[in-house]
């Protein structure tokens, strides 16, 4: 009997236009859960070594979470998986919205695509019946137009995942969109979808999702929701920056309590951290060479939390989320009502490029969402091009006449449009900064801020070394949604998992930069826990409530009927981590090549600002982490088998 999971996946052969359902044994869910765990098990053997990420041998998968649809909270995440054309290794992108339960209500835990369609198509699953339909009339349309059309055509109740022009044009920094602005952006998987000439998935199902103890799941959810709804008064948005200033100047630091971050998220969303992050040295500035000195409180005032709150027409909640950190905002630009930009997007298109023009940030964010292009990588690529222009590596002639100086919002908007269309210099930049630098030469690679080919997110590891560790060791490099010292403090896993260290409540800041076994244990615990979360479909923001308040492990047991301990679930997370690492080794990716670049780890250290004088011993931190994973501490290669290989699909 299936419990929590549907027990089946759907294979779609785009070349042959054939469908095949596959039953997944129950013991596989017990070993790897669902979500990216199930996907890692499936794709480990089914994508052959050397497969072209943009070729027919690559597999593109859409997976839901084991807890999605069971009545548990914060379980609306869906994931896209495949071999990444950006990094050459394991690729997955995680997204909110409303698609995740739609996958399961069609009767599947995942939908996987092989081959390449001769012409553009979209997949429609209507009450269990899969069908490939012509998408020629939709090719070239943006994600919002396409989604609106397909929902109307399906009767108004379907959920849609769709690529825009960036994915169609095989941009290596393109993603996959749903709900008009929630995007599975990282790893370049929009290009994989475009290479298969697959425009969209349209899902319309009503299958009941089985739950072992539905009443218990609901009881746990009610208990958890009491913590979510606590919302004491907080300071005005512009004052948050001064809290950051105080945190920066004090020699000591207090361990972060997730309930505080919950208050910020519930009131403002992720933009609550915009100015504060600049002040404490968390938000990178001027392509990672600047600091709060260059983009201080005065310059960043335009992106203070209340600037977004004042435009918010309605809050946006992902499926099963009581927090509602998203929003729909009104703008003065051409798009009218748009999704509120997230922190990552604001800072990538803002401080990273020294741009304080709020209206331009709204405009570029919506342009990129409609095109289906990653705002983090797009912002990182813009900042790279700006520094190349500053250094004389790119000239105004190279940039099609654009005066790409720091903070030139009009030039940024024009360049974003060119990148989306692959027009002029936009064609050079559409695949991200590393690919562009390799074509430019002339030392341009010195200004690419990446790990393993993926532009880095808006969290500076010189402030929190845990970010640099995870940027450098995850199977999907340059990732900020797995772990950091800050995350470990908020997860509070030591309250539920035996043997994990409890950080002190107050500690000297210098303690963060000491590479030792305790830091490695914390980092490995974050990886394992988030692998469990991504197998369950849990949102990281919900997990910040702390392990004693959000019943992740209890939800899993109640939904499935299992009786696993927190330690057993963490072991599952470790097994998933190793599967993904093995995938990279199989596909010729050297784990050493994922190390974040020198500037990002403080080589040389900055001479002013919040992160002045800080350098990470990233090699030791990485080696210590690999040792905690049971891998070779010098090479990052796993040793020994951890699971039987899944069978290859029948021809």
What are these regions, as identified by a protein language model?
Residues 1-94, 98-648:
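Intrinsically disordered, low-complexity segments enriched in small residues
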């Amino acid at each position: 009997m299936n419990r929590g999971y549907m027990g089946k996946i759907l294979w779609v052969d785009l070349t042959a236009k054939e469908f095949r359902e596959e039953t997944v044994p129950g013991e596989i869910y017990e070993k790897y859960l669902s979500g990216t765990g199930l996907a890692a098990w499936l794709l480990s053997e089914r994508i052959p070594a050397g497969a072209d990420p943009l070729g027919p041998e690559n597999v593109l998968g859409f997976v839901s979470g084991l807890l999605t649809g069971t009545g548990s909270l914060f379980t609306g995440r869906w994931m896209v998986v495949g071999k990444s054309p950006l990094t050459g290794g394991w690729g997955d992108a995680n997204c909110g919205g409303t698609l995740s339960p739609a996958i399961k209500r069609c009767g599947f835990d995942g939908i996987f695509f092989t081959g390449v369609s001769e012409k553009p198509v979209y997949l429609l699953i209507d009450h269990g019946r899969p069908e490939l339909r012509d998408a020629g009339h939709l090719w070239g349309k943006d994600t919002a137009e396409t989604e609106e059309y397909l929902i109307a055509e399906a009767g108004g109740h379907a959920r849609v995942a769709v690529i825009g022009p960036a994915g169609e044009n095989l941009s290596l920094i393109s993603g996959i969109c749903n709900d008009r602005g929630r995007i599975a952006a990282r790893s370049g998987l929009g290009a994989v979808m475009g290479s298969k000439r697959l425009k969209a998935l349209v899902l319309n199902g009503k299958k009941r999702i089985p739950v072992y103890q539905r009443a218990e799941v609901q009881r746990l959810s009610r208990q958890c929701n009491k913590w979510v709804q606590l919302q004491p008064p907080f300071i005005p948005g512009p004052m948050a920056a001064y809290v950051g200033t105080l945190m920066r100047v004090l020699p000591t630091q207090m361990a972060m309590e997730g309930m505080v971050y919950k208050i910020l998220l519930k009131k403002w969303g992720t933009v609550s951290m915009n100015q504060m992050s600049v002040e404490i040295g968390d938000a990178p500035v001027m392509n990672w060479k600047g600091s709060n000195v260059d983009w201080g409180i005065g310059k960043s005032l335009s992106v203070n939390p209340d600037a977004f709150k004042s435009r918010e027409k309605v809050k946006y909640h992902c499926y099963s989320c009581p927090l509602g950190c998203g929003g729909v905002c009104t703008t003065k630009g051409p798009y009218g009502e748009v999704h509120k930009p997230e922190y990552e997007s604001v800072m990538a298109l803002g401080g990273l490029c020294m741009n304080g023009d709020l209206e331009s940030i709204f405009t570029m964010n919506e342009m990129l969402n409609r095109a289906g292009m990653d705002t983090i990588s797009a912002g990182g690529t813009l900042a790279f091009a700006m520094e190349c222009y500053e250094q004389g590596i790119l000239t105004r002639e190279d940039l099609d006449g654009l005066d790409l100086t720091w903070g030139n919002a009009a030039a940024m908007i024009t360049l974003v449009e060119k990148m989306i269309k692959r027009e002029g210099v936009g064609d050079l930049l559409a695949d991200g900064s590393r690919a562009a630098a390799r074509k430019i030469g002339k030392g341009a690679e010195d200004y690419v801020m990446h790990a393993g080919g993926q532009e880095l997110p808006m969290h500076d590891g010189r402030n929190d070394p845990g970010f640099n560790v995870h940027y450098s060791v995850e199977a999907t490099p340059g990732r900020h949604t797995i772990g950091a010292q800050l995350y470990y403090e908020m997860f509070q896993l030591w309250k539920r998992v035996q043997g994990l260290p409890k950080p002190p409540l107050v500690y000297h800041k210098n303690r963060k930069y000491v590479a030792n076994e305790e830091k490695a244990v914390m980092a490995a615990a974050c990886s394992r826990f988030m692998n469990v979360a991504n197998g369950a479909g849990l949102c990281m923001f919900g997990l910040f409530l702390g392990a004693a308040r959000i019943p992740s492990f209890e939800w899993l047991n109640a939904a499935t009927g299992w009786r696993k301990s927190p330690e057993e679930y963490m072991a599952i997370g470790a097994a998933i981590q190793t599967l993904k690492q093995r995938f990279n080794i199989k596909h010729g990716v050297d784990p050493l090549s994922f190390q974040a670049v020198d500037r990002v780890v403080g080589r040389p250290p900055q001479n002013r600002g919040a992160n002045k004088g800080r350098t990470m011993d990233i090699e030791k931190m990485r080696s210590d982490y690999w040792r905690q994973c049971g891998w070779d501490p010098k090479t990052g290669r796993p040793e020994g088998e951890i699971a039987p290989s899944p069978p290859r699909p029948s021809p």
